[in-house]
A protein has these predicted regions:
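Glycine-rich, proline-tolerant flexible connector loops at the mouths of alpha/beta enzymes
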Residues: 10-47, 101-111, 177-193
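Active-site-proximal loop/turn and secondary-structure-junction residues that shape catalytic pockets
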Residues: 23-27, 70-72, 97-101, 151-155, ...
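Flexible, glycine-rich active-site loops centered on histidine and acidic residues
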Residues: 75-123
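Catalytic cores of alpha/beta
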Residues: 74-86, 164-167, 193-196, 216-219
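Active-site/ligand-binding-proximal alpha/beta "capping" segment
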Residues: 136-174, 178
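Hydrophobic faces of well-ordered beta-strands that scaffold small-molecule active sites
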Residues: 2-3, 17-21, 64-68, 93-95, ...
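Single conserved hydrophobic/aromatic residue that forms the stacking wall/gate
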Residues: 1, 5-9
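Alpha-helix-loop-beta-strand connector modules within alpha/beta enzyme cores
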Residues: 33-66, 112-149, 192-211
């Protein structure tokens, strides 16, 4: 859309090496049918991540990194996204669990979807080998996907401690993650401490600080 095009034009002034394309999970809205009955409708934002990524890559010749989520996606829906990205020769991904739904107190997968990013990594690894979620196989002719994952210098809100976060980050790296991008942090010291802790734990991939420009105070 117009807003996204304007953002890309501004970003080009800084000669970015890549642009991350966020993904929004599907959400459910309830329509009042009267007589105490409600109809649940599943909605997903449009245009989708694949369309936005393809438009940016083709129009501006900038590498794009679409986000692939557990939240709001079944295994089959994830496979469709991977097939579309492969067809478009978009092979760099950021693999995330994603947020819980607005009405949830704890994270719940969509259908047969995944609880953890490491499970999503396994599906992508199998896809790179030509193995679909139903067990059927295809001949691999395209470049395989490479991907990064998330990490949390100030601890994930659901983690008991930073050691637990480091444990799972190491598992994600062992499963194939080539780098990690941090969640937003508000104390630079926490980032540098986390990088040193990761090295001490045997995590040797690049850890990139996640930075989000704020336009207004309420975004904090």
């Amino acid at each position: 859309n117009r807003r996204q095009r304007q953002m890309c034009i501004r970003d080009r002034e800084f000669d970015p090496k890549y642009i991350n394309i966020t993904t929004h999970r599907s959400e459910y809205v309830y329509k009042d049918l009267g007589n105490g009955l409600f109809q649940r409708n599943r909605l997903r934002r449009r245009p989708g991540t694949v369309a936005v990524a393809a438009a940016i890559q083709n129009k501006y010749n900038i590498t794009v990194v679409p986000h692939i989520l557990c939240s709001g996606f079944s295994r089959e829906e994830t496979e469709y996204v991977l097939l579309d990205l492969q067809f478009l020769n978009i092979t760099d991904l950021l693999v995330l669990r994603g947020d819980k739904a607005k009405h949830e107190s704890v994270f719940t997968p969509e259908g047969d979807g995944y609880h953890h990013a490491i499970e999503l990594q396994e599906q992508i690894n199998n896809f790179n080998k030509g193995i679909f979620v139903d067990g059927s196989e295809m001949k691999v002719t395209n470049s395989p996907f490479s991907y990064g994952v998330a990490c949390y210098p100030e601890k994930h809100e659901e983690a008991p401690n930073i050691e637990s976060d480091l444990f799972w980050l190491k598992k994600k790296v062992e499963a194939g993650a080539e780098y990690a991008v941090t969640q937003l942090f508000y104390d630079n010291k926490k980032y540098f401490e986390f990088v040193e802790q990761a090295k001490a734990a045997g995590i040797n991939v690049p850890i990139i600080p996640g930075i989000k420009p704020f336009k207004k105070l309420s975004q904090l």
